[in-house]
């Protein structure tokens, strides 16, 4: 089988390995540092973000959060982590899947183990969404070309 006529919709394992990982630091959590290979954009996906993420020991995947509009999922490929979902914590590992329909409980991953965690992450890219960060009492409003955040304690009744 020749790959000279391979469609632009196909990424081989070698193609994926050649995508340089980009370091992503969460805007509200400096310990949430992900090494991300973005797959969806490479094959032209516009409404779904698809990424392979590496989370080093001691790191968090994101600030504990939930979305009003975007659904997302995680599928663990390698390693272990603690999944914090709502008020509970669970150990997760290779082969485990988490899906967050809207509305969902707030969630994050914490790599408390001594090896990297690798997972497939995908989610919607709705043009409008509100992301809530309950532990830091903050929300972010996302609209076309704009992202704004506000502290819950700074809100006043009208």
Model-predicted segments: where are they?
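Short acidic-glycine-tyrosine-enriched beta hairpin
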Residues: 87-102
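A short, N-terminal "cap"/entry segment at the start of jelly-roll beta-barrel domains
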Residues: 1-47, 131-158
């Amino acid at each position: 089988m020749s790959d000279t006529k391979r469609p632009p919709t196909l990424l081989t394992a070698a193609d994926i390995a050649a995508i340089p990982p980009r370091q992503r630091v969460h805007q509200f959590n400096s310990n949430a540092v992900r090494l991300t290979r973005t797959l969806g954009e490479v094959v032209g996906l516009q409404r779904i973000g698809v990424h392979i993420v590496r989370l080093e020991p001691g790191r968090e995947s994101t600030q504990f959060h939930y979305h009003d509009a975007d659904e997302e999922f995680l599928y663990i490929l390698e390693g272990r982590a603690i999944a914090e979902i709502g008020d509970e914590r669970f150990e997760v590992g290779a082969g485990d899947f988490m899906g967050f329909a809207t509305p969902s409980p707030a969630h994050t991953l914490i790599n408390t183990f001594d090896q990297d965690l690798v997972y497939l992450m995908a989610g919607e890219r709705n043009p409008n969404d509100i992301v809530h960060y309950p532990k830091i009492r903050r929300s972010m409003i996302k609209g076309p070309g704009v992202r704004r955040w506000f502290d819950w304690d700074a809100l006043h009744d009208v």
